[in-house]
Amino acid sequence: MADLRFGEQGLQNFTPLMDLVPRQENMLQRMGLFSVVDYTTEKVTEFERRVLGIDTMYSVERGADRQYAGDEGAQTALLKIPFFTLDKVIKPSDVDQLREFLTATDPETVRSRVEKVIARIQRGHVELHKNVMYEALVNNKTYAKGKDGNDRVGYVKNFQTAFEIDNAEMYNAAADGAATIDLDDQTANPADEFEKFRKHVFNKAGDGGDNYRLVVLMGSGSFTKLKNHSDYVEAFANYASNEEPLRQRLGGLRTSRVLEWQGVTYIEDVSGKIADDKIIGFPLDMEDMFQLHYGHADTIAAQNGDEAVSEAYLYVREVDGRRVGVESEAALVACITRPELIARWSE
């Protein structure tokens, strides 16, 4: 039975076909940075920020008053889930192929033709996920841009503001963890600045742990300057033999330049989402720090909870007697629950 979109005629749900052309993962996904925490039928979703604490255990006499552990710090932020659409008009014959693929005994006979219909739509969803994740990491806020390229009021929230975190808690005691670095200065060792960040993360993490990796993601221009800096030339020269194992641990980075040195992993970002003179530092393996929440489709069935929440949706609707519309959509929001553990440098 066709799903009904609000105020429109019947739709046929072809969402399973989105899996036919898998989304290509961006660098942040290959690193395993963002985890999917929730699939919700609500239009507003809740993110929790937990700050762990450590209690000191003192030596006491047996039978003496006992010590008690404190409570964990927790804050919540309510964020609207932005909704995105990408449609395409196709021929009725293309729809027949979609139906045939879903019902055919031998679907391989039409697979290649169906893939062409889905592939263009899926590339748009790939770009959407990249924008959502990089906006969170680079600009410390949710992604919801309108057609004019401007942030949509009510949907875009700064994470530091949402969790009411004072600048004093942020790296460099600055809003959004902003800082500056001069990679052209050969008299100053950049490692000193990155060591300052490493200590900041350990001090603010609150869990006493040392099992997470520290990553410095760099625009290509900044990475080249670091590679050519007098204090790093030798490190890069001696690194080639270890580069490939590291790539595998970080999800098989194929084209980016990488260096692991003195407890920090430097990675060149080639996505185009980080400017040449920008640098982002953050810890990996921090549980639930980078989250994705997905919302429901814009159909009556989804609104009533009768349609499963998914990462993307695909529907077919007749436009007129000669044309058919393919309607794809997604509802998702990213959140960084520990923004105080991120540094954002500008040259």
Predicted regions: what is each one?
Residues M1-N13, E193-E243:
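Charge-rich, low-complexity N-terminal segments
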Residues M1-V44, C335-E347:
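N-terminal alpha-helical "arm" segments
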Residues F84-D166, N189, E193-G221, R322-E329:
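Long, contiguous amphipathic alpha-helices that act as assembly "spine/axial" helices in icosahedral shell
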Residues M31, R198-F202, E311:
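Short alpha-helical segments and helix-capping/turn motifs at coil-helix boundaries
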Residues F6-Q24, R152, V156-E193:
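Hydrophobic alpha-helical segments and helix pairs
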Residues L33-E100, G154:
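Assembly/oligomerization interface modules of large self-assembling protein complexes
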Residues D184, H229-E347:
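Sequence/fold signature of self-assembling virion shell proteins
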Residues L17-L20, E193-V201, L292, A297-I300, ...:
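Short, Φ-rich (hydrophobic/aromatic) sequence segments
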